Amino acid sequence: MRKLALVPIRFYRYAISPLMASHCRFYPSCSCYAYEAIENHGLLRGGWLTFRRLGRCHPWNPGGYDPVPPIPTSRSSSMAE
């Protein structure tokens, strides 16, 4: 399911995005963010992170560096160290 969700993002990045002027105010771009978020966090959480990121992408937001949050580690593995 995750790989299927990444197909439209890949299509946009390689077929549509090069035809448009660069508009993204964030680094990485929103499409790169969406791809990485879904790939790392899965369809549900990655989709939610992407939805929130797209909500921040507007003219009144200064943009800047906004990476995908790291995958949370479980407390039991961090306590064992």
UniProtKB/Swiss-Prot annotation:
Principal location listed in the UniProt entry: membrane
Keyword terms: Cell inner membrane, Cell membrane, Membrane
Annotated localization: Cell inner membrane
Protein topology in the membrane: Peripheral membrane protein
Residue ranges, annotated region (Disordered): 61-81
GO CC annotation terms, alphabetical: plasma membrane
Family: Belongs to the UPF0161 family.
Described function: Could be involved in insertion of integral membrane proteins into the membrane.
Descriptive protein name: Putative membrane protein insertion efficiency factor
Species annotation: Pseudomonas fluorescens (strain Pf0-1)
